[in-house]
Amino acid sequence: DEESTWNELPWKFEAGTPNIAGAIGLAAAIDYLEEIGMENIHQHEQEIVAYLLPKMQEMEGVTVYGPSDPAQHSGVISFTIDGIHPHDVATALDMEGFAVRAGHHCAQPLMRWLDVPATCRASFYIYNTLQEA
């Protein structure tokens, strides 16, 4: 005779050993963000976007997707360059020391709606500088 004994909620959904190292890492990341301050991070991202977005919008052959007002933009800029596949743009930028993501970014319905096969996506965070932009 076999029988099962079910634990009470929420423990019955725990399978095996909890990710202890992950929990410790998450706590350290939260401490790091609290030390810097989320408002400081947001202001830093906005400073970079306010600098770079207008420059990209003025570049011939570059299409920037998203709000044109830097104040309404997040720390991510998606773009395409006429006549060059985004994967090729990403490869060329990588060769110059710039890391961007190219592809559909798990948003295929949006790419179909935009009528593009993919975009390049540059993202900025607290460790990026204006000089890098």
Question: Locations of the language-model features?
Answer:
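Pyridoxal 5′-phosphate
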Residues: 1-133
